[in-house]
Amino acid sequence: MKKILLLSFIFISPYLLLSQNNLGQIHGNFETNLQSYTDDPSIDALAADEIILNNAYLNILYAKGNFRVGLRYESYLNALQDYDSRYQGNGIPYRFARYTSDGLDVTVGNYYEQFGNGLILRAYEDKGLGIDNSLDGVRLKYTPINGLYITGLIGESRTYFEYSEGIIRGADAEFNLNESFKLEGETSYILGGSFVSRFQKDNNPAFNLPENVAAMSARLNIMHGGFNYYGEYAHKINDPVGSISFDKNNYASGKAIVNNLTYSQKGLGITIESHFVDHM
């Protein structure tokens, strides 16, 4: 199937409300992607029945002082080819309110978050891949002292225009030794740890499925000159694995190990990586 790009339009408005009157500022952008498709006999692909497909997004953000609220309106009429067909219709799946002050950052509504390398928690958006698994709930970030960053959250994961049945609870702490102890020199040290728990009610009378599944991770980042090392270990417990039968409940722990070593200088970059993932 061959596609013809009819229109890809982005509009950005930096100011819609004058800040001189102390009313705050409204920012926004609008994007629409319309595509038309034709038959491609070489791969036996047929054109879409709708002739024209469209993905459109409208973002609106209001900001005043330390306070921000925003929303995103999404329209899939119908979704572009290669997008999941469950992206269909119109709605406002993303809206939030956020307040920041003196090391405190509070968000209610939708938000994106990643702990470490994302082994046990990664809520992110990539419209090009058709991925948006934002969390809807409450997130708290706090910096009690220089170099210590704490995050706590609870929410439900977005699934297209709905939300999953499970509830995600998580906490993360990152400790930058150089910032906390005012260390000087070329070497920087950052330690981190995370904990995530998922609750999902067991509505299956045939199996004794765990309603709470937990995962934890620890990470280390060392930077020296052009060298950068990042390592993280994650462990998950109490989760079903493989097929489950009436006479056997298969529960197993999972683990993942990530090691990244990079070196860079002008005109040269070297990366060595190793990833091990089992039942995560």
Stretch-by-stretch model annotation:
Residues M1-H27:
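Bacterial Sec-dependent N-terminal signal peptides
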Residues Y76, L80, N90, Y94, ...:
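Acidic, small-polar-rich N-terminal luminal/periplasmic segments of exported/outer-membrane proteins
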Residues N21-I26, L34-L53, Y62-A63, R68-V69, ...:
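Signature for the C-terminal beta-barrel architecture of outer-membrane proteins
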